[in-house]
């Protein structure tokens, strides 16, 4: 399974049409994901910038380091590949020299909003306009992209399955982290594996970090009382998905069960609105608004969701203030969360496809508290966990 050559050709044509409609003479592409989206060519930039100059009616030119020139020449929709000498370079041979030559004579130049300050300074005389042309193209997925995202979501589900199977009272964080290896092995075995565009993270935020969703657990952390948030977060051959579940390794208290139920209801209110034509801000108001009505507004930290594609976080943004409106074949997450000091965090997340008349959740791991309360002793799992801890020196 892979994106076909013809699709990359069509993507470039759509970008050229967007450049024309924006009344620009040319558009400079610099983001790694954008270049991958347009060409399908995998590379690792390190300190070396890459550029594609797209004009509406003439050839597409790519500027890359000399050592990547032949590799990049395989792009199906690039007419010319130019090269610069490795950094630092002799005068006249560096990337900035090549870039100035590339944009010479252009009066109306568009650039990506993510353009770095270093590159912006080189072309400041052109007064380039930051326009999210590629971000807009990426919002609605093709049939091949949906297939890639569906595949990525299946591996996100597998990661969550591995997390839950490895969990028991007192399990260490390193035992959960180590489950990602099995997922990556499956990706290697079953797909056209792209090592530079594949990454897998399986983790569990222990209750002590439950109110810090972007905190970082120690590999020696142990999961004991309270709600824990399992996260299976990956990119498989260029396309991203996630599955998150709140789970317990002891019987949840009544208060925990009530917060879990309210989190599920907020999700249900979001799901009920997912269909083409619905503003993303309306979905956020339904989910987070419900939690505020329940008196829990002080325990909200983030929007209801975000988009998926090449990135784990991209448009459309399911947030109050978002201008995005759902269309068929968009991908979003649904993840309203509660973060209550002294109690913990409560959040599920799914990777969701917008269909012609509603939605399809591509991640399908069970969501109910009964399936996510893990009280079995799991003697063999504990033994395997002890071997993992010993291998990495965790007591």
Describe the function of each predicted region.
Residues 1-395:
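Active-site neighborhoods and metal-handling regions in enzymes and metal-associated proteins
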